[in-house]
């Protein structure tokens, strides 16, 4: 995952909606498909760009309002109960995109598996969505709204997430206050990966991040280790009152084998 209108499969493919070509939405109407593909290749190393239609009148046109990659081959696509359940045209758009992606492959050439997820009914200018969720470690945070119909049901959707994502717990969050602003959980979040990195063993001063310079980024690296934002590859950081002097501070680094 990367952004509202940019879903990466981790294998060199990205799914975006065609709102990116819409000058009325603030984008460059002169942008061509070839230029778009070159931008993704240059900046993200992506070699395959899949462009789908976007929902109508959802406030964003972003792909993450009705499509979600949960791994490199499994794609959730929203589904309305009938033509009248969504804003005019969106029932057909969801089905069109589901069929399009079912005939696509990921960046490694493997076919996508499509899972349809109910879309709550469009109401009072609001496009409700269960698809705009966020995966965090062993949980998936799912927007819920209090729907309990046979088709769009909060509890059933949470169960569906846990079925298609074994080992993860689906946690519902009431998003009635934010969905009128045209987004839910995925729209308002950003992710910081916990990446293995190397620091200078036995030395908490100087060039801690081993980039050949001593600057503010060395301090930030230490803070990131202590707070758990990043995870050390070759060294471990301890924190707290390591010296029993009554003062809690950054402790020492100790070398260890990478696990």
Residue map of PLM features:
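Histidine/cysteine-enriched polar flanking segments
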Residues: 1-200
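Cellulosome-associated attachment modules in secreted, modular CAZymes
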Residues: 197-258
